[in-house]
């Protein structure tokens, strides 16, 4: 949204909105701005969630491989039996197999194809902390 649009919604002037945004950026509350692109527009028809459990001694190499494969669009290091949970965007099942083959020599994987995302990426509530 433009500063003018934000000002109208918030009931503030555009310069006031601009100043508040600048202060939030300086404090690190706002870390940046992004564009929301639909991966399907670039041929990425499938998304998968991959649980990854590195083989003994392979943790660092698995992490390097995940970072090196750009189709992995998100990855979290987690507690539990698996070490990583990652999101992957691919154009086909064949591409999925090819990419997973690079990981499967270093780790056990469990893959689920995403059918639908009822909750899109969103922020948690921003209100005051409840006791």
Residue ranges, per PLM feature:
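A compositional/biophysical signature of low hydrophobicity enriched in polar/charged and small residues
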Residues: 1-131
């Amino acid at each position: 949204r433009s500063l003018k649009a934000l000002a109208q919604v918030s009931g503030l002037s555009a310069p006031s909105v601009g100043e508040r945004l600048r202060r939030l950026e300086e404090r690190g509350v706002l870390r940046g701005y992004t564009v929301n692109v639909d991966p399907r527009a670039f041929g990425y028809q499938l998304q998968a969630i991959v649980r990854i459990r590195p083989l003994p001694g392979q943790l660092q190499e698995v992490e390097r491989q995940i970072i090196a494969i750009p189709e992995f669009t998100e990855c979290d290091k987690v507690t539990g039996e698996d070490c990583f949970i990652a999101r992957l965007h691919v154009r086909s099942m064949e591409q999925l197999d090819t990419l997973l083959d690079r990981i499967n020599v270093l780790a056990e994987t469990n893959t689920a194809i995403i059918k639908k995302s009822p909750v899109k990426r969103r922020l948690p509530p921003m209100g005051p902390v409840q006791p």
